Amino acid sequence: MTDISVSKIRNFCIIAHIDHGKSTLADRLLQDTGTVKQRDMQDQFLDSMDLERERGITIKLQAARMKYKAEDSQEYILNLIDTPGHVDFSYEVSRSLQACEGALLVVDASQGVEAQTLANVYLALENNLEIIPVLNKVDLPGADANKIKQEIEEVIGLDTSNAINCSAKTGEGIEDILEAVVSRIPHPQNEIKSPTRALIFDSYYDPYRGVIVYFRVISGSINKRDKILLMASKKHYELDEIGIMAPDEKQVDELHAGEVGYLAASIKSVADARVGDTITLFNSAAKEPLPGYKTANPMVFCGLFPTDADQYPDLRESLEKLQLSDAALKYEPETSSAMGFGFRCGFLGLLHMEIVQERLEREYDLDLIVTAPSVIYKINLNDKEQIFIDNPSTIPDPQSRESIEEPYVKMEIYSPNEFNGTLMGLCQERRGIFVDMKYITTDRVTLIYEIPLAEVVTDFFDQMKSRTQGYASMEYHLIGYRKNDLVRLDVLINSERADPLTSIVHKDKAYGIGRGLVEKLKELIPKQQFKIPIQASIGSRIIASESISALRKDVLSKCYGGDISRKKKLLKKQAKGKKRMKAMGKVDVPQEAFMAVLKLNQ
């Protein structure tokens, strides 16, 4: 396998927005080069998780090695490295771009350039990749290739005179793409003599062999008898096997600079082989790791609780297993008086959170309650100390803190300009600060806002899509913390604080949200034998209150007629019982009530 010269290797990836046909195009390339036999072919071949196929998104990276005989009758090795297109996974994208020399920029010929595509194109340009524009879905009746070419030139500044028109569905233009990959993407640098360095661009957990690491050799070579060192985690391993993905794993003896492959070395967890880490040889280690490694930090937090308390050990076990294959997931145990035992989990973003939740429910058969998502707040205490908190119910009381700062993001929204008004309205409702508005083409516009992350993580994305009939797309990145007039809003049920419903809100919005919460709870909590007050409070001040009236048992039903003093005695006894009940009684809030309130539009 390794007698191929570096000049015959091409490493490339596909950059595309969700739904622009990236996975279908990858299927066609695998099929046309004969990498996957016709009978084994299934749609979205590289998307190995059911969830990926269903949602039509790529979550975990995959890689495939194809052999292609070009028109110059030379045989080339093409390594396709698949990338996720969603904003939550931008770090994963940046690393897979580092493993390539070129990229196919796939744009739907009926829809045009979208926000996440743009973000990834800029990442590719930063990594000096050769970009080949490809217009997909040209067979659709609504496709207008020339208009989209012009848009790519105006928005990204790429020359589209030699852009390729293709339809991954019908197979038109696939040959042209393969030829372009060979002729336009540069071959890897020939650094076989330098010290060995390889970049990890993906890893997954295999229950039998431990972590399988996908890597690209940047310089030097790796032999299956070598002992390797991972430079960021400082751990060393004996190799069990190395090989290539074609696209099923195939063992080889050695991989040289420029090649892409996998290795297994009985690595216990994905956290030991982090994406972006550098592999080198234990005996002759490289001096410097490859640049750009950073640990992915969670931005969104929420509590996960099993609906059935007996499932707590199962939840813990399944989170441990998930973390083996998802290094960005963080979790720690948490207890709540209302929900019992559960975990506080950190995610890269909302999509990541939904996917983890869905995988827990689907792959591990758990029934979960998820508390409202929150972000990391910076609390400035009176003694000038700063603390970071991701759980609103643990924020100190107003007397002991000076101010609360919250993370802000810079957001770019791309949309047809007829939706301008409604999008600007949405951003203003979410406390966004207008920065700029640019017309990309005569009918497409970019809105740039600075907006608190907490306002984005609830349901901003859904709102944006529904207000623009699905045409708008967005991408955002953190720009730092800012002070705001924020307060902790507590919900008290029968004078006891319900932790899962605690949230941090802006002072101006506190009354509206508090009012909504208590009204919703009043509908949902069943009546008890005594009166239950439900209150929303900021500190010690109650800002909204409702009460659920008591159920009344008719204690007089058995005295027909009879003496009035007998009736008074029974009523007095009942009143006394209710008073005792109110003091002793606990209100059992059904979990449906929590669920409904958490779904209540933020």
Swiss-Prot record:
Pfam entry (one): LepA_C
Its membrane topology: Peripheral membrane protein
PANTHER family per UniProt: TRANSLATION FACTOR GUF1 HOMOLOG, CHLOROPLASTIC, TRANSLATION FACTOR GUF1-RELATED
Gene source species: Prochlorococcus marinus (strain MIT 9515)
Full protein name: Elongation factor 4
Keyword Magnesium: no
Similarity annotation: Belongs to the TRAFAC class translation factor GTPase superfamily. Classic translation factor GTPase family. LepA subfamily.
Broad enzyme group: hydrolase
Subcellular compartments: Cell inner membrane
